[in-house]
């Protein structure tokens, strides 16, 4: 079951910047993968174990999940994962996070809240201004991964990304990344539930041009 949290709430206007990368990661020079809407963080933790040659930051709007996720990585001594609480757009718009934005090599938006009602579409995480912010920061050949079980949301996200004219859709056969780092093959809790329920999953990859 999806837990709705209004990302436009004034509670998310004031945010704590993410600490400098050299305070968060053992090796801050590694490429950075950002997971927007990371939920409990299990997806990123699994991904980080498959490839320790990347750093990972998860952003989640439900504070309790972030607190629990950071407790997990502290207890298990992960050296390349960090979780941050808040509205992703506000966090990445914060000038104190510029070094983080400049380090982004790939981003995943997996099973974001669909906000079905049209009047609530403005609450969806992928918005034109957010894609514009990311495109201005992401280097050429940086990647965006999306997955959802809602076809209308998939079409909306794809259109928003492609209309920026900064990204093009990448065919899976053209996806060339070390197999140990492959966000497509690592499943989130939501994805496991969807597959178990035999629902369809819509997914795609976009490359910065």
UniProtKB/Swiss-Prot annotation:
SUPFAM superfamilies: S-adenosyl-L-methionine-dependent methyltransferases (SSF53335). Keywords: Methyltransferase, S-adenosyl-L-methionine, Transferase, tRNA processing. GO terms for molecular function: tRNA (guanine(46)-N7)-methyltransferase activity. CDD domains: AdoMet_MTases. One of its GO terms (cellular component) is tRNA methyltransferase complex. Pathway: tRNA modification; N(7)-methylguanine-tRNA biosynthesis. S-adenosyl-L-methionine binds at residues 35, 60, 87, 113. InterPro entries: SAM-dependent_MTases_sf (IPR029063), tRNA_(Gua-N-7)_MeTrfase_Trmb (IPR003358), tRNA_methyltr_TrmB_bact (IPR055361). It is an enzyme of class 2 (transferase). Catalyzes the formation of N(7)-methylguanine at position 46 (m7G46) in tRNA. PANTHER family: 3-DEOXY-D-MANNO-OCTULOSONIC-ACID TRANSFERASE/TRNA GUANINE-N 7 - -METHYLTRANSFERASE, TRNA (GUANINE-N(7)-)-METHYLTRANSFERASE. This is tRNA (guanine-N(7)-)-methyltransferase. It comes from Prochlorococcus marinus (strain MIT 9515). The gene is trmB.
